Swiss-Prot record:
This is Endochitinase A2. The keyword DNA damage does not apply. The keyword Lipoprotein does not apply. It is an enzyme of class 3 (hydrolase). Pfam families: Chitin_bind_1 (PF00187), Glyco_hydro_19 (PF00182). The gene is CHI2. Belongs to the glycosyl hydrolase 19 family. Chitinase class I subfamily. The active site is at 133 (proton donor). Residues 21-61 form the Chitin-binding type-1 domain. Induction: By infection with the fungal pathogen Ascochyta pisi. Keywords: Carbohydrate metabolism, Chitin degradation, Chitin-binding, Disulfide bond, Glycosidase, Hydrolase, Plant defense, Polysaccharide degradation, Signal. Its EC number is 3.2.1.14.
Length: 324
């Protein structure tokens, strides 16, 4: 078999020189059809050259979901998102456990790296961040504010979120406001995500609010896909990201706080104490407690410079104090 390896790799190299990549970071986070593995070079296949070292997605084939259901049961899911089907919640009864598992089959690396505690910590982090994005809780809410995640489905009082783009042009009459667990917004995000999961979200953005599996897929796509200069949320929370010297100088270290920075750092991070960051942490801690696992280090981003920001951290903090 070793004699065949060189020709196969040579073919991969030749193909890569002559056509566009098919998947992974080289193709905007696109997944391979039929559950095929995405190689480190951005090509789809099922052999060890594709599924082995450096594989980017679907590295175990199209199984997915099974491992996830052994980590979080339907009862645990319902306990975490305890009031999502309350009559006061806009999202009732949209967000289901089965839709979550079904969507995760397209992202088999989700909650599938490291020991059991690491896998559960990723689930807690994902549900914690998305619960904040969709929360219907308030300080004196029944069972506390962190039992009200996944209450909302669509952004309240939305804008159109349309930015001129030749690659992902806005469709006539369509709005790209926040929808679903991660509240995906802007035409370029709908376009990239739709391309990756194989759905035309530019022309049909409301699928994110009408099809629960697609809705969860958009959130998982965002979670699993790095977008330079940001790493993926998945890599950060599972220990797969090593901060550069620039990251360390900006206060960005492995942990839940950097996940918050990836999602909304421009508005929430590097500004000292922030109630939104506290809310994200509150959901995360509750879910970790339900799982019976530790929280890890670096939970907040109060002293982190947002990704892509060239301002000194002290300037961000000073601006915040001056505005207070």
């Amino acid at each position: 078999m070793s004699k065949l390896r060189i020709p196969i790799l040579l073919v991969l190299f030749i193909v890569s020189c002559c056509s566009a990549e098919q998947c992974g970071t080289q193709a905007g986070g696109a997944l391979c059809p039929g559950g095929l593995c995405c190689s480190k070079f951005g090509w789809c296949g099922s052999t060890s050259e594709y599924c082995g070292d450096g594989c980017q997605s679907q590295c175990s084939g199209s199984s997915g979901g099974g491992t996830l259901s052994s980590l979080i049961s339907g009862d645990t899911f319902n306990n975490m998102l305890k009031h999502r089907n309350d009559n006061a919640c806009q999202g009732k009864p949209f967000y289901t456990y089965d839709a979550f598992l079904s969507a995760a089959k397209a992202f088999p690396n989700f909650a599938n790296k490291g020991d059991t505690a690491t896998k559960k910590r990723e689930i807690a982090a994902f549900l914690g961040q998305t619960s904040h994005e969709t929360t219907g809780g308030w300080p004196t809410a029944p069972d506390g504010p962190y039992a009200w995640g996944y209450c909302f489905l669509r952004e309240q009082n939305p804008s159109t979120y349309c930015q001129a783009s030749s690659e992902f042009p806005c469709a006539s009459g369509k709005q790209y406001y926040g929808r679903g667990p991660i509240q995906i917004s802007w035409n370029y995000n709908y376009g990239q995500c739709g391309r990756a999961i194989g759905v035309d979200l530019l022309n049909n953005p409301d699928l994110v609010a009408t099809d629960p599996v697609i809705s969860f897929k958009t959130a998982l796509w965002f979670w699993m896909t790095p977008q330079s200069p940001k790493p993926s949320c998945h890599d950060v929370i599972t220990g797969g990201w090593t901060p550069s010297s620039a990251d360390r100088a900006a206060g960005r270290l492995p942990g839940y706080g950097t996940v918050t920075n990836i999602i909304n750092g421009g508005l929430e991070c590097g500004r000292g104490q922030d109630s939104r960051v506290q809310d994200r942490i509150g959901f995360y801690k509750r879910y970790c407690d339900i799982f019976g696992i530790g929280y890890g280090d670096n939970l907040d981003c109060y002293s982190q410079r947002p990704f892509g920001s060239s301002l000194p951290l002290s300037s961000i903090l000073l601006d915040t104090v001056a505005a207070a």
